[in-house]
Amino acid sequence: MCGILGGTNKNWNYKEGIWSLHHRGPDAQQVKEFDDCTLAFARLAIIDLSEKGMQPMTSLDGTVSIVYNGEIYGYDFLKKELEKKYLFQSNTDTEVILNAYLEYGEDFINKIDGMFSFAIYDKRKHQIILYRDRPGIKPLYYYHANGQFAFASELKALVTGCTDVKWDMDYTALYDYLFYQYIPEPKTMYKNCYKLPPAHRLVFDLKEKRIVSIKKYWKMHVNTSKGIYRKEDVLWDELRTI
């Protein structure tokens, strides 16, 4: 696993924030400042151990950058399709996501399968776009208040890195934890800080300084025509025989 972090306030301590994710990415850490935001990455080198696999990774035309944690299944097949148009500098699935986004736009997410959470900085649109995998295997948190925005693989990276933020406890989340023994999404223990739900896409506009959309990009299809749903007494009888 790797760790990702990013935000809009250039005065935040991204080095300390990404170092707090050292256990997720012990091989290397890197912070890179862009025009509208800062991206940081803690690397666990698995695919393409060379420096070419380091993140944040930027497209060859310089318009789109990414920080990514996860694994894309069968990415080689998509890479072969994209190689007809794009020149690849690495053997990573990270670069496949990057070029798929350039080629297909929002629809690129339908081309990939796997466990992932990542952030794309689109310089052309002045947007940060977050994605989380369909089953929610890889975590992704975000903070938004007073026009400021940040995201990270773990909550403590936000608390450590966003140095001027007042982290007030959300007591409704505390109640949920005491009642359910966990905090339901999208809440976290802090106000203005949330978990991005599984299979969701978030778009933050860097010019307007606001979240313009949080949308579900995938929905599980259940085939009800094969007798999955049966009468309650039948189900109870089956349960007793187990």
Predicted segments with their positions:
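Cysteine-centered catalytic environments shared across enzyme families
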Residues: M1-I242
